Amino acid sequence: MNTNQIILTDQGDNYVNLWSHVAQDLYNHYGETLYNSWFSKVNFIESSLNTVILCAPTNFVRDWIKSKYSMVILQLFQHYNNTIKSIDIITKELPGTTQTVIELPTKTFADIGSSELNSENIFSTLDVRFTFDNFVVGAPNELAYAAARAVAESSGAVSESNPLFLYGGVGLGKTHLMHAIGWYIKQNNPSRKVIYMSAEKFMYQFVKALRNKEVILFKEKFRSVDVLMIDDIQFICGKDSTQEEFFHTFNTLIDNNRQMVISCDRSPSDLDNIEDRIKSRLGWGLVADVHSTTYELRLGILESKIEQMNVKIPKDVIDFLASKIVSNVRELEGALNKVIAHSNFTLKEITLENTQNILRDLLRSNERIITVEDIQKKVASRYNIKLSDMSSSRRLREVARPRQIAMYLSKALTLKSLADIGKKFGKKDHTTVMYAIKKVEELLENDIELREEINLLMKILQH
């Protein structure tokens, strides 16, 4: 970030230029994922009495930025111009923009008794583990979390995020958020009628209704709810009759100001074998990408899970899991459960070595192959020592400590035995490697700076 003050007048063009500097700083600080979620569609409007006025695309985005980022944005503005005392964020139509209003045909539906709706109890299909309280929020999923929370808290009014379309890879938290919406509504607005089900089950119930000549009951059931949540909508791709029924259900609910939440493994525009009119409607509201997890988010998820389970796991094991199980949250939690279960059944202590052995097969499928040589090169470069120092016997601290760190990382990031690692470090025996690992583990207990340094090296080596 430029450390020089930019002296500005009240001319709009200058403030637009200033906002571009602030936006770039936000991008640099928070990264592409979070920037695209919140700031990319924010525009400068005007300045008045030392106040900069920005425009957000929706009330939802405006409120989230105000609550989470307003002070950071103000400080960035003041960095460039210290006469700015405050910022305000509004929502309004920008000059020169137009909105297309699509009129949906008005439909009516019969009011059916609660016993009919309750024949399928939503809460029997919700997982008690999946609530907002135990959803770990990070940059990759912040937009999706905030949108899901807004839908749940809408208290009967339809949110701006209608439909809310959540998409991303398997095991990243989409289903968790949908269940969390259901539980929140049950606890805070129990009179609201909610249906949650997979697209596959939606199709099977529709086919059953056709076979039993109960299509009218099917339509009434799904079109008389306050919130309809359909998981894995990609399942109806290529299924024309189900798509047709979903299309009319969607239209009826949206036309009657009912909330829809939909999940998918890809964005609406990337769906194949689905009608264009459905693609278009899926993108009407808020489309939120649940991105792949970062190391920090995986670490937070593990720590939260460990706290819930009230177990003790060594720090090096937690760091190892967060570094190695990168595919999705489901596999990450599964790996943790497997390690804990193995310890409970065998009465063996949870150690890094045991963890590596227990998860050997899973690690192979997740792991980019990292060699001891890769680690030696990265560590030598990081600490500005010669690569040959890794296999030397020099005892100078500036050489010995990086060598110990490289041995520690070799054990953490490869499946090599201590003896094999020792051979790569100038034919040292396994006791020397063991001493180095224990030394680093002891230092990690209290040395926060070293812990951050090793975490950084792990991330560099993983990607």
Swiss-Prot record:
A single GO BP: regulation of DNA replication
Entry keywords, A to Z: ATP-binding, Cytoplasm, DNA replication, DNA-binding, Lipid-binding, Nucleotide-binding
Stretch list, region Domain I, interacts with DnaA modulators: 1-83
Keyword ATP-binding appears in the UniProt entry: yes
Record-listed ATP binding positions: 171, 173-175
Gene Ontology CC terms: cytoplasm; plasma membrane
PROSITE patterns, per the entry: DNAA (PS01008)
Chief subcellular location: cytoplasm
Annotated region described as Domain III, AAA+ region, given as residue ranges: 125-343
Entry GO MF terms: ATP binding; ATP hydrolysis activity; DNA replication origin binding; lipid binding
Residue segments, region Domain II: 83-124
Matches recorded under Gene3D superfamilies: 1.10.1750.10, 1.10.8.60, 3.30.300.180, P-loop containing nucleotide triphosphate hydrolases
Entry-linked Pfam families: Bac_DnaA, Bac_DnaA_C, DnaA_N
Region entry Domain IV, binds dsDNA, spans: 344-463
Location in or out of the cell: Cytoplasm
Comment text on domains: Domain I is involved in oligomerization and binding regulators, domain II is flexibile and of varying length in different bacteria, domain III forms the AAA+ region, while domain IV binds dsDNA.
Similarity comment: family membership: Belongs to the DnaA family.
Role this protein plays: Plays an essential role in the initiation and regulation of chromosomal replication. ATP-DnaA binds to the origin of replication (oriC) to initiate formation of the DNA replication initiation complex once per cell cycle. Binds the DnaA box (a 9 base pair repeat at the origin) and separates the double-stranded (ds)DNA. Forms a right-handed helical filament on oriC DNA; dsDNA binds to the exterior of the filament while single-stranded (ss)DNA is stabiized in the filament's interior.
SUBUNIT field: Oligomerizes as a right-handed, spiral filament on DNA at oriC.
Protein name stated in the entry: Chromosomal replication initiator protein DnaA
Organism encoding this protein: Rickettsia akari (strain Hartford)
Gene: dnaA
